[in-house]
Amino acid sequence: MTYNAKFPDGFLWGASTSAYQVEGGAQDDGKGLSQQDILNEEMALKRGVANASVASDHYHQYKEDIKLFKELGMNCYRFSIAWSRVLPKGRGEVNKQGLQFYHDLIDELLANGIEPIVTLYHYDLPWSLVEEYDGWISRKVVKDFEEYATLIIHEFKDKVKYWTTINEQSIIVQYWTQKCYIKEKYLNQNQLRYQINHHMNLAHAIACNLVHDVVKDGMVGSAIGYSPIYPLSSKPEDVLAMQNAHDLRNAYYLDVYFKGIYTKSAMQYLKDNDLAPIIEDGDMELIKSGESDFLALNYYASECAKAAPLDAMRRWSGVNWSGEKGAIDGFETQPGYYQMCKNPLVDTNDWDWAIDPIGMQYMLKDIYTRYNKPLMITENGLGAYDVLTKDKQIHDTYRIDYMHSHIAAIKKAIDLGVEVLAYSPWSAMDLLSTSNGYAKRYGFIYIDRDEKDPKVCKRYKKDSFYWYQQVIETNGEKL
């Protein structure tokens, strides 16, 4: 097939970050602690990686960063608001300095022709709510999220058109101890993974309704960590396992956002295995009311599934902590349902994530066919070891190759009729990796710091910066 599509006029080209990974200023100007401040401090002590106290110092250097964004050619920037910066205790008294920071940030973006795409929640629940009632485990968090979302959406309703609600609920289920602070007494209560997700679905619906009620011409959706799933082989058992994995790892979330239901096959599996969330009267009506206008997709890699025996041991997704290929510490297994596994037909990066640009095209076409809603790419990128040379250059041709192939795949999906609104990859600048500190870098802009010493976080443009600049300048014609 010959592909002739062009990116549409008005296509949004940008890049993404999240508050705790990039801002720093973890307790500056009245900000309260978040669970990520605590989790990253524990990770720093355990594994010797950086914590979130300084991160990439965006809080103090945002004006310089936005100048670089404008030079890059970005016309959108996806970022998150730190709940504990504006409501240090999670509710109640508003921190006016924290709120003003986001006004200043958004005003600076708009003055430079950059459309803000605001994420309300990116893993960083106020620590006080964890201390008070165990955070997202408790249904109480839904009311506090509503107070927070109401504040932010009303505050920025005249400045922000595009909103995403909660980042990567599917990833939170798999990696809950990295994305939430889970007390030791709960670690074996795996039903709580899906209870947390249910509470987030209620919060998502509330935020969707707020945007629709408050923001003129506003658009809102969730940002999902999404991996299309292939069967390991054409054996019927593996194909069925792939279908099961899709139902529980993907459809279970998307059906909520666009149909207001839990995927029946996945929910039946959860019920049969004592993993299903407790659903109260009125919950599904609320979820049904909060329909998304678009879906924001965070795509890094495809995944692979095979049949799992009934007597297999249940486990959740593994992590490669070292950055040495092949060092991943396991794959999710749901007994009798599916087992995730390595795909022998695709290459991986140093952290064992599959490099699969065709998966991008497949994902976009599949989701658009199923749900017929506009799509955004709000994360996509290559985590890698970057080297700052003596003459202050960063020659990241591997990142250029990765992004070239993935943008080309988006263009092919558009040629097949898929409506894609934006490409906002991960990440605008190097930032704190949740698992790997500053060893694993994603940015177009290099942050000169290491795990122990943040130095002054001086910024340097990578080779990929100049390449992406040309991509944006030509609206994706020059890749």
Q: Which residues does each predicted region cover?
A:
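Active-site region of glycoside hydrolase catalytic domains
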Residues: 2-46, 89-91, 99-479
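A common structural microfeature
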Residues: 10-12, 59, 76
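Aromatic- and Gly/Pro-rich amphipathic surface segment
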Residues: 32-67
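N-terminal, well-ordered alpha-helical segments
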Residues: 60, 67-70, 100-103, 107
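Catalytic domains of carbohydrate-active enzymes, especially glycoside hydrolases
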Residues: 61-82, 290-294
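Glycine-rich, proline-tolerant flexible connector loops at the mouths of alpha/beta enzymes
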Residues: 81-94
